[in-house]
Amino acid sequence: MQSKEDFIEMRVPASAEYVSLIRLTLSGVFSRAGATYDDIEDAKIAVSEAVTNAVKHAYKENNNVGIINIYFEILEDKIKIVISDKGDSFDYETTKSKIGPYDKNENIDFLREGGLGLFLIESLMDEVTVYKESGVTISMTKYIKKEQVRNNGERVEIS
């Protein structure tokens, strides 16, 4: 029988090679918690984006040598995932101003590349908070029981 709260922690090198390991772990955690297939897939995309951003941007000044910490907190009605690094931070407001949503009439040949990670994370998860002190920490929550989801327009908090 599952306890009301479980906690799993991973610490991996900031390397793209470990994204698949993190995704596999996430699948197991979400499956054990009783999440739907769609919730598992949404969370895998969101976590992949957050980890890939850390791999690409956090340690670029340090020859991509660094560590990414991933925490899964499994609660009765939700799963909270925290991804953190100690690398370079970024200006959230500037980054956000450059991301979607895209205009459906926009010519696909002129769509800007990159910058979709935060947009995808916000779109796929129920709650998202970005902390920018001492690196970047992204906290995201996926509710397993959907009645818990807050119905608000802006779900990303910055602190």
Swiss-Prot record:
Enzyme class, first EC level, given as a word: transferase
Domain of life: Bacteria
EC numbers, comma separated: 2.7.11.1
Any Pfam family the entry gives: HATPase_c_2
Classification via Gene3D superfamilies: Histidine kinase-like ATPase, C-terminal domain
Source organism of this protein record: Staphylococcus aureus (strain MSSA476)
Record protein name field: Serine-protein kinase RsbW
Reactions catalysed, as given in the entry: L-seryl-[protein] + ATP = O-phospho-L-seryl-[protein] + ADP + H(+); L-threonyl-[protein] + ATP = O-phospho-L-threonyl-[protein] + ADP + H(+)
The entry's keywords: ATP-binding, Kinase, Nucleotide-binding, Serine/threonine-protein kinase, Transferase
MF terms (GO), sorted A to Z: ATP binding; protein serine kinase activity; protein serine/threonine kinase activity; sigma factor antagonist activity
Tagged with keyword Kinase: yes
Similarity remark: Belongs to the anti-sigma-factor family.
Keyword ATP-binding: yes
InterPro entries linked: Anti-sigma-factor_SerPK, HATPase_C_sf, RsbW
